[in-house]
């Protein structure tokens, strides 16, 4: 009887840990999401990369996105 109770509690603990892990993973920002700073909560293997936008020489603000770590975008030559 003790073995059945112990096994049930162990299974409940494992299921609870799996659920908590799934909730923590869902709390991060996926690829392509807008983030606010370089230290935002992008998912693992992603970083928050920011750039400044200019239109006709006038700064239009800063945009930040969650992109794969190490990936860099550059301006296309016209």
Swiss-Prot record:
Contains 4 disulfide bonds. It comes from the Eukaryota. InterPro entries: Spider_toxin_CSTX_knottin. Keywords: Disulfide bond, Secreted, Signal, Toxin. The keyword Oxidoreductase does not apply. Residues 23-26 form a propeptide. Expressed by the venom gland. GO terms for molecular function: toxin activity. The keyword Signal applies. Residues 1-22 form the signal peptide. GO terms for cellular component: extracellular region. It is found in: Secreted. Belongs to the neurotoxin 19 (CSTX) family. 07 (U7-Lctx) subfamily. This is U7-lycotoxin-Ls1a. It comes from Lycosa singoriensis.
């Amino acid at each position: 009887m003790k073995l059945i109770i112990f096994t049930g509690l162990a299974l409940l603990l494992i299921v609870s840990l799996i659920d908590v892990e799934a909730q923590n993973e869902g709390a991060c920002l996926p690829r392509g999401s807008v983030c606010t700073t370089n230290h935002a909560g992008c998912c693992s293997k992603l970083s928050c990369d920011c750039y400044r936008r200019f239109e006709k020489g006038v700064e239009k603000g800063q945009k930040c996105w969650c992109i794969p770590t190490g990936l860099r975008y550059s301006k296309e030559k016209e």
